[in-house]
UniProtKB/Swiss-Prot annotation:
Belongs to the ClpA/ClpB family. ClpE subfamily. Residues 74-105 are annotated as: Disordered. SMART domains: AAA, ClpB_D2-small. ATP binds at residues 152-159, 481-488. Residues 407-598 are annotated as: II. This is ATP-dependent Clp protease ATP-binding subunit ClpE.
Amino acid sequence: MLCQNCNINEATIHLYTSVNGQKKQIDLCQNCYQIMKSGGQEALFGAGNASNGNSDEPFNPFNDIFSALHGQDFNGAASTQTPPTQTGGRGPRGPQNPRAKQPKGMLEEFGINITESARRGEIDPVIGRDEEIKRVIEILNRRTKNNPVLIGEPGVGKTAVVEGLAQKIVDGDVPQKLQNKEVIRLDVVSLVQGTGIRGQFEERMQKLMDEIRKRNDVIMFIDEIHEIVGAGSAGDGNMDAGNILKPALARGELQLVGATTLNEYRIIEKDAALERRMQPVKVDEPSVDETITILRGIQARYEDYHHVKYTDEAIEAAAHLSNRYIQDRFLPDKAIDLLDESGSKKNLTLKFVDPEDINRRIADAETKKNEATQAEDFEKAAHFRDQITKLRELQNHEVSDDEIPVITEKDIEQIVEQKTHIPVGDLKEKEQTQLINLADDLKAHVIGQDEAVDKIAKAIRRSRVGLGKPNRPIGSFLFVGPTGVGKTELAKQLAKELFGSSESMIRFDMSEYMEKHSVAKLIGAPPGYVGYEEAGQLTERVRRNPYSLILLDEIEKAHPDVMHMFLQILEDGRLTDAQGRTVSFKDSLIIMTSNAGTGKVEASVGFGAAREGRTKSVLGQLGDFFSPEFMNRFDGIIEFSALSKENLLKIVDLMLDEVNEQIGRNDIHLSVTQAAKEKLVDLGYNPAMGARPLRRTIQENIEDSIADFYIEHPEYKELVADLIDDKIVISNQAQETAETTDEEVPAE
């Protein structure tokens, strides 16, 4: 067995100890053992200052072993071949090595000097936080309890306030009491790390506080200050970092600046004694205009880092688009993310040279040149010399101003599209054509509902132009009418026209939400109930895909509490789920369908019905099913009229196109004569049932006949459906053409 230190000599010394209840063994040779015995264990395994546990290498596995062995009698703890009996208790310490490395200060070891970073110009400019910085300075200028805590939502710029304070100290723009102060950010995780033995953390905290008292020029900054509550606690006592700091915080011996979020500040509020020693400073989210100012202040830093240029339009777009489309984050953080990510994406288009690859190629060329020179092949040596010159020029090449890429508003829009799946850029490019042709495109697929299509197209135009409220959904409509007239079909086609795919539609059948507790299915279960950790079906899907159409079928079947929940969505475009997250519906289109009230006016449905009177009658019946405040929040209540025979003839063509699309997979094509179409309408016409009976009629008279004919004659691919003896018959196209030619009868 070789020595674990030098890995050369044979290990003749075996040391045993117990660390954290586990038995550890070190195998050393005689020389290495003498070095450790004399106190020079820093030479072994790079252990550093093992006696106090503050090693430069905190993850060294031998630190705790050396700490445990340091207090033992080495003469009794080692033997040449047989393991000694483990000794309890601590003996006197061995002589210290005078050449041992002196430990760094606690603040230097566990902290980062923000003031020094400000002197070197390494922090970004702090813009628009003068009031918060002024408030922090006022609290720090107090005699006691001079410990400000910055609280605010994630990403609003709490840490930037502390950096602004450090910059003001460097500039001398602070009161006399704060002159020459040093703002040092303390890493609580590193402070707790390596304190596995009871009492080590308390000793380390005491040394830290003693050092701060001696220096008397330290303002300690703890990010995520709620971590000090319970930090270092053994679990069976209250001796954590928060309790250790309480006396010093109350007497003003220690100046502390903290930062935490609103939710996590509640952890500190639970400890009233700790909370009273701190003075909260609220950091609010900046406005869009303030965010633009902040972005312009840090613009140069990101341009230098990414080697790009930002246009003024890109800066403004980053603020406006992030505020409009990114809902889960806060300004200015989400706007800075757009700036940074767009710069990163554009930076990848630059053709930078890998320095390591160039150095490797230069070294290879140097070697080959020397070999050619020694071989007196001077022509080849000259070739490698020229190659080295070109490589060095390439190594020193810098991107000129003309080659620097420029980030425009279009680049910012692309980043927003990637993050939110909302086609921001396409909205502007295709908006005019889409809005002009929206009604015609919908009428091509939804037959007989021209009035309803025109109303919804006008409402969407108003919303797109910006005449609607900014926080309301794109549109909210209630489709009312008898069954089978195209209410759901219009919603599908609308999703396809607006969002490019009918899959963007989020559909709910409200017959599944007839119970009071079914509200939890939409927004999530309340705390304490099964399924609390799971997200709601509605809120989660909208949060993941905010640009979508929400279809609520048969809304009158839903429980009243479910409809009450939609009052806030229709009015304010927002809803809070069971987890407390606010979900935005500003980019959603909400459509609800209902046939409520149509049963009482069926007698007036038909060819000669007075449409004006029927409309008033249906809308009047809705009051029996929906509350006035619910109906009053829609952008429009659209009634669908019953379908006429002429409408069904057009619908037959659409349904037959679907049949041809299905059988086209087998290379079959079907042609239907006009007489057969009229027969299908006669068989499937029912004013009270709409177009659904027509689908069943086509299935029975067309699809079944095609299946029978194709099974008997699989070689025929061109089929025709004609009316023969008042029956619809499927035959081969060529055969049908020959018969009609002989009889001189028109095909249709």
